[in-house]
Amino acid sequence: MNILVVNAGSSSLKSSLFLTVEGRVEATPIWQAQVDFTYKPGEALIQTRRRGGGWEPFPSASPEGGIGQLAPLFQSLWQGEGSLLPQAAEIGGVGHRVVHGGSLYRQPTLITPEVERAIEQLIPLAPAHNPAALAGIRLLRQLLPGIPQVAVFDTAFHQQMPLAAALYPLPYAWAEQGIRRYGFHGINHEHCARRAAEILNRPLEELRLITCHLGNGCSLAAIRGGRSVDTTMGYTPLEGLMMGSRSGSVDPGILIHQLRQGMSVDELDRILNRESGLKGVSGLSSDMRVVLEAMEAGHARAELAFELFVHRLRSQIGAMLMSLDRLDALVFSGGIGENSAPVRAAACADLGFLGIQIDPVLNAGSPRNCDISTSDAPVRVLVISAQEDWAIATACQNLLQGE
């Protein structure tokens, strides 16, 4: 059986096809696709690749048509010359990443009309992402009628946080209206926790972990016994750490001040989400690689952006530690977490008093799914590849098999 994964965002789409062998999902997909709807005015960039091959162009689409026009991309899996599958029925299930499931969904869920309506009702909490997920769900239902579809929610992993971690110190009536901390990146935080247990060869139930998902979006999670007990993102993915173009947490009084100065709500939203973070401070880019290159060339604001990013990261690592009774491992994942040795080194600098000490040689050696601590460090530091699509496929497979 094959599992198709669809990860639809506001301006992009990623998809993977995984083969299952003896009930287990293979780690490497046999087919991948990526769509960038912002590639050029009036043109989307579509690329596909098969296992072992490179990316190849697929006939372009118009950005205005959105996800609904991507039927030929998915149909190419079972139709036409060179198709991978003899028929559409070879796909046994479709797994969708859904960013926001609110407090309703704590685990992967078979998509029914009721679930679809709930995802639609949650659009105000994820206006950039839930509509894209719905478009993907509806397109694949049209292309693969009768094939079960599963929603895997980015918020689900955090829904068992203690109320003290989940609620804001605001009027309780607001919490009753659903204004609370939901957390995000849960699919990868949970994957990292399970993978850490494998690397450390210890039962997940006994581990105390802090997982750092650092990419264009960034969040941390404190994980005790495989369960999230705290996280840095909240009601929206805007809370918490400094990110690529998002501000992270700021004094709400600043926002009130700007509104009183005449800034519109839409403009404030745009600045906080798209013009802040690394991009806003450096004045250069939301890409940490660009910031590091500029810093090495002596760019003062790039250096400031890096230092601010690291300061806030270290501060929140400390905050996550307070939700645990000890720390067994600190885990780095995501585009920055996996690929930026300078960020890992700076984040862990002078933390020997906590038992954290990384080996500079191991840290600099492009580590993947391994331990980069010194041999005698009480707390292990791991680098784990984010494999959200595989995690979604596995969750889909387990649900369909009744595990």
From Swiss-Prot:
It is found in: Cytoplasm. The active site is at D154. Substrate binds at R97. GO terms for molecular function: acetate kinase activity; ATP binding; magnesium ion binding. Its main location: cytoplasm. Catalyzes the formation of acetyl phosphate from acetate and ATP. Can also catalyze the reverse reaction. This is Acetate kinase. It comes from Synechococcus sp. (strain JA-2-3B'a(2-13)) (Cyanobacteria bacterium Yellowstone B-Prime).
